[in-house]
């Protein structure tokens, strides 16, 4: 599903260069559930943005679902993003003036689907997250957990092959966080690839595969990296690969 090889990304200002990713290499297969961890500024959000076609890269190659991203026009990239990828954000990113139904409808409108088909997809997505009875409520009338479930439904409504979640439980209490994790596991169990950024090691442990991003490099925990390397204040370990 995701295949990056030697991807590098540098952010430049007038006097400063920040290397967000350096020779970053990763393969994430179809229907995997992967948790991405790392300290602030490590490059994990940059990786997620590039994976989601929200940002470009300077060097390397990226293949998404068998397509070479570097060969796509902006229009082709937008279409691929809309049809293949669902996004979940920490801050929900719901439109306050739209009710639940219309918030979930937003990505479908860009596809030009007929209204009847859109309604079927929206009702299906809201049923998955348990919010069918709330479709005419507005975000301000919902709890934080309910708002995030709306965000999950919006990400799910287009039946994407890839779900990218950036700190999806960051604004929720532990009970609500576990509900969102349950939803992500159900979505993954239905065959959708899920890639989740989180700071919470307990939530990350629910993913079958965990990856650490440190100083723009990748460490795959399947490589049996010693636990002391991840203790607060420990020296930055050498990357297992991609460095």
Can you describe what each PLM-predicted range is?
Residues 1-213:
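ABC family nucleotide-binding domain
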Residues 217-243:
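Conserved beta-strand-loop-alpha-helix hinge in the C-terminal portion
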């Amino acid at each position: 599903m995701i295949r990056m090889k030697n991807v590098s990304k540098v952010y430049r200002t007038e006097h400063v260069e920040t290397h967000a990713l350096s020779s970053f290499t990763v393969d994430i297969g179809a229907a995997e559930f992967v948790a991405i961890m790392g300290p602030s500024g490590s490059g994990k959000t940059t990786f997620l943005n590039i994976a989601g076609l929200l940002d470009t890269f300077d060097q390397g190659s990226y293949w998404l679902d068998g397509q070479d991203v570097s060969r796509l026009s902006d229009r082709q990239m937008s279409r691929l993003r809309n049809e293949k990828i669902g996004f979940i954000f920490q801050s929900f990113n719901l439109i306050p003036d739209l009710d639940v139904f219309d918030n979930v409808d937003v990505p479908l409108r860009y596809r030009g689907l007929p209204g009847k088909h859109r309604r079927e997809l929206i009702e299906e997505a809201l049923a998955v997250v348990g919010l069918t009875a709330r479709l005419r409520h507005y975000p301000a009338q919902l709890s934080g957990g309910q708002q995030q479930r709306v965000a999950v439904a919006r990400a799910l409504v287009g039946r994407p092959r890839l779900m990218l979640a950036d700190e999806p439980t960051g604004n929720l209490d532990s009970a609500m966080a576990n509900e969102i994790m349950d939803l992500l596991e159900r979505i993954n169990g239905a065959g959708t690839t899920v890639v989740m950024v989180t700071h919470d090691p307990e939530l990350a442990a629910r993913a079958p595969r965990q990856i650490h991003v440190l100083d723009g490099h990748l460490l795959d925990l399947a490589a049996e990296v010693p636990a002391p390397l991840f203790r607060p204040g420990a020296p930055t370990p050498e990357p297992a690969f991609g460095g």
